[in-house]
């Protein structure tokens, strides 16, 4: 990703917006920093050598800090297959690095919401002089979503797995809360639901898993199976909605 950013800069980009989420790594942004020639001793990078400033904006849907129980290693490490010992070691390295950064730049990564987003890429963007903002809010602004919702009768959204992390700014909950301002109900269709009914009811009219029967994860994420399950659930929902709109 750092190489892509560098290429964009060399082609004349002056503002780069990076969407953070769904990464395949959880390295605290180390690879990203290295590809932009970040010097871990001085805190300087490729961006510091540019004649004209470049604005980096990180769009994130979570507010995790850089390290600790809610940091990138502890929360996202298991998703990447990290063992307990690897996660503990990575979190300790992240903690030490954050202390060094504070000493170098008086930047406290631990107090910046989203610095642990995308395996720590949020923190890396901050170290390069960038800022973090709500990914949903930015996309909603570009799409003029707030205005569009005012003329809706019902919102249907989705999530691979609806869980407690979803309540930390992820799209399904964020759009449900925006729709709620205009008394527009929201239904969520999910691959799996791992949130208590009471918590889900705070934001959604209803939450449904698309699965039709007991199924393995491998089978559940098969594209053909997923499309079939969504079609079946969507058809049943439309029948239900039509019945109440007679």
Predicted segment positions?
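N-terminal loops that bind phosphate or other acidic moieties
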Residues: 1-246
């Amino acid at each position: 990703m750092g190489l892509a950013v560098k290429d964009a800069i060399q082609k004349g980009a002056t503002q780069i917006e990076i969407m953070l989420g769904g990464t395949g790594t959880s390295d605290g942004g180390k690879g990203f920093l290295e590809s932009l020639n970040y010097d871990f001793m001085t805190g300087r990078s490729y961006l510091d050598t540019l004649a004209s400033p470049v604005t980096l904006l990180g769009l994130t849907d979570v507010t995790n800090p850089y390290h600790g129980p809610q940091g990138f290693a502890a929360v996202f490490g298991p998703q990447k297959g990290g063992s307990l010992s690897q996660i503990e070691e990575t979190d300790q390295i992240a903690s030490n690095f954050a202390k060094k950064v504070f000493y170098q730049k008086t930047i406290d990564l631990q107090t910046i919401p989203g610095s642990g987003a995308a395996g720590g890429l949020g923190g890396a963007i901050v170290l390069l002089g960038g800022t973090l903002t709500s990914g949903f809010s930015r996309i909603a602004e570009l799409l003029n979503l707030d205005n569009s919702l005012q003329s809706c009768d019902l919102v249907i959204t989705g999530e691979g797995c609806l869980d407690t992390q979803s309540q930390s700014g992820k799209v399904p909950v964020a759009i449900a809360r925006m729709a709620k301002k205009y008394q527009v109900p929201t239904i969520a269709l999910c691959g799996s639901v791992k949130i208590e009914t009471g918590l889900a009811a705070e934001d959604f009219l209803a939450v449904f898993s698309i699965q039709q029967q007991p199924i393995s994860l491998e089978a559940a994420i098969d594209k053909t199976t997923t499309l079939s399950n969504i079609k079946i659930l969507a058809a049943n929902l439309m029948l239900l909605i039509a019945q109440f709109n007679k």
